[in-house]
Amino acid sequence: MLLQEAAIPVLPQVAAACELLGLDPLYIANEGKLVAIVALEAADAVLAAMLAHPLGRSAACIGHVSADPHCFVQMTTAFGGRRVVDWLSGEPLPRIC
């Protein structure tokens, strides 16, 4: 799977706080989010349906699945490089509800 960092919808306030605190938004608690893996031929219709709903206004296609069954989840960074999206090491930050 190859993700595009620039395509991941992160609120500017969240991005600023993460940058200030040295955190990666992918590894902090986040509620009310959905990652859907759909067939390529259905992607446009699924995205359009999500965007049509008030709660899906920030829906986005953030990547694609590779045909290589041994491929790691990777991300193309904002600078054009690639990095492996690894499991979180250690304990996640607690949710504040």
Regions found by a protein language model. Give the residues of each.
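Acidic, Ser/Thr/Pro-rich beta/coil linker or hinge segments at domain junctions
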Residues: 53-97
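Short beta-strand-to-turn element immediately C-terminal to the catalytic PLP-Schiff-base lysine
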Residues: 36-38, 75-76
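Short amphipathic alpha-helices in soluble, non-transmembrane regions
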Residues: 45-55
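Active-site-proximal betaalpha loop/short-helix elements
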Residues: 1-30
